[in-house]
Amino acid sequence: NLLLSQSSPYTVIEADEFDRSFHWLSPYMSVITATDPDHLDIYGTEEAYLESFRHYTTLIQPGGALIIHKDIALKPDVQAGVKVYSYARTEGDFHAENIRIGSGEIFFDYISPLGNIDDIQLGVPIAINIENGVAAMALAQMSGVTNEEIKEGMKTFRGVDRRFDFKIKNDKV
């Protein structure tokens, strides 16, 4: 999966480790959300699977960044000049605090070494999107997106059609 734009120098790609095709990429910035053993029919062992992710981290361009979930046991092997950050829901270099969930809405304060942003509202109020949002906001900040643009983007993001859609939202349902 990828997102291309005629007016942006950035491309967003959901990389796939299935057949090691992510080894063909040379990202400037990357997020690794999980390394749960998968595709062992291809990799053979959990160790080989993790080694494939370690190799992927060597492909990040100097001057870029790796944002890796803090619970991942992977030891990245980045090139000189690549910054490595951690993230998670409530811990890490990038994380959420003051999480408020209720009435079909989620708000939180985004904590970042690049500058905090208060009162983030999720457009798709599903708890896992707190963590996903933290990683997305980290990439956005590193790309020069303003705090106001980040807040608006998080609030208006609607996700994939037909996933977690509200059909009715009132006090009775």
Report each predicted region and the residues it spans.
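Extended acidic/charged loop-beta regions that coordinate divalent cations
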Residues: 2-38, 76-119, 160-170
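Residue-level signal for inorganic ion chemistry
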Residues: 33, 49, 67, 96, ...
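Flexible beta-alpha connector loops of hexameric P-loop NTPases
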Residues: 38-47
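Substrate-engagement module of ASCE P-loop NTPases
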Residues: 52-60
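A generic alpha-to-beta junction signature in SAM-dependent methyltransferases
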Residues: 60-61, 158
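Glycine-centered, small-residue-biased loops immediately flanking beta-strands
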Residues: 64
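Gly/charged, well-structured mid-domain segments that form the phosphate/adenylate-handling core
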Residues: 86-87, 140-173
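Short glycine/threonine-rich catalytic loop with a Thr-x-Gly-x-Asp
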Residues: 103-106, 124-135, 158-164
